């Protein structure tokens, strides 16, 4: 059984992320979606909330596990005996950055981690968590950008931010 890892901050998970997850399952038998914290980012949702949003979308998927990790992703992968890292790419900028991480992960894992790049579907090339949060903050429709199961959660969080002034 081939197990892959798809990691990100997912603040919040978007249809773009969801698309990569679904397409990754055509390559691997099981996918661990790892929610991580990036110290450079400010989050709307805490780690547990982000995991719950993902779980809500994939609750009926037996071959998807949602987990979390603080630290180097290669350490998580070693601990879970995973050698396949899935990365979604929206554009050349993403490719350039992820290619560098790919080399680093290969080196840090002593050659045990291979990265598979999946280009985003065209309709999601401009969709990002930041874009979704901006739409939500201004009380715009999130249809087509996030799964229906999490729209209310995101809009409620946006309202909290608006109410803070």
How should each PLM-predicted stretch be described?
Residues 1-165:
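Nucleotidyltransferase catalytic core that binds NTPs
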């Amino acid at each position: 059984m081939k197990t892959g890892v798809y990691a990100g901050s997912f603040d919040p998970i978007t249809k773009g992320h969801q698309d990569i997850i679904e397409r990754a399952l055509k390559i691997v038998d099981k996918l661990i979606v790892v929610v991580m914290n990036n110290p450079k980012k400010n989050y709307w949702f805490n780690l547990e909330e982000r995991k719950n949003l993902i779980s809500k979308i994939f609750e009926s998927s037996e071959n998807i596990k949602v987990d979390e990790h603080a630290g180097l992703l290669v350490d998580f992968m070693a601990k879970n005996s995973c050698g396949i890292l899935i990365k979604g790419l929206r554009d050349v900028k993403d490719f350039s950055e992820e290619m560098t991480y790919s080399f680093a992960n290969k080196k840090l894992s002593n050659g045990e981690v291979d990265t598979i790049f999946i280009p985003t579907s065209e309709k999601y090339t401009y969709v990002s968590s930041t874009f979704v949060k901006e739409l939500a903050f201004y009380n715009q429709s999130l249809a087509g950008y996030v799964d229906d199961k999490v729209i209310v959660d995101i809009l409620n969080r946006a309202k909290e931010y608006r109410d803070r002034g």
